[in-house]
Amino acid sequence: MKILRSHLLGKWYAGVEESFTLLHDPTTEDPLAAVSSAGIDFRAAIEHARSRGGFALRELSFAQRGELLIAMSKAIHEHREELLELSMKNCGTTRKDSKFDIDGATGTLYHYGALGKELGDGHVLPDGPGEQLGRSSIFWGRHGRVSRDGVAIHINAFNFPAWGFAEKAAAAILAGMPVITKPATSTCLVTERCIETVVEADCVPEGVLGLICGSVADLFDHLHGQDV
């Protein structure tokens, strides 16, 4: 039986055997995999995402972040057939249904990658035109949107384990925020494989994309005002 792993702190973690939860094929009820997040230091994982992943993303321009997303899309798409089969087993869907999820994930990542290219080589997104704030143009201001210094925590639903992770991660990464994604345990087999293909392709900096398979435990206790 496959043991599903979390990916945090630049490493894979299989959890503690005594706390495993079983995943079953919804059609046959056969066990597919076991999962646990017990033993993971979530405080350290969050700090690592902020300091390593966040710093790496903020150093990149919008266009460069877009290139990361396109690379993620291609990495996942290369395993499309495998992921479709996995989706049918893990989610109990038809092949046609599974295509919505897998192709939705790669299509969304690619689209946000293209948006990054359109935004160009800057690091700040201007918010409207500038305004003269005094009698002369010497006192002038303009709002700009910059990356937050925290991490984006995504708790996802069971029905789109690939697309759900991808559409949230794409927006956050383009905005310069590292991601820790937590798929629904019942269908996290698909998400784990998606993340695994990205890690194997080595297409994003360490700390940018994290995965929790299993319980979030005390994760929320370690968040602060810059996290979302």
Describe each model-derived feature in a short phrase.
Residues 120-228:
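Rossmann-like NAD(P) dinucleotide-binding subdomain of oxidoreductase/dehydrogenase enzymes
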Residues 1-134:
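N-terminal Rossmann-like NAD(P)+-binding subdomain of aldehyde/semialdehyde dehydrogenases
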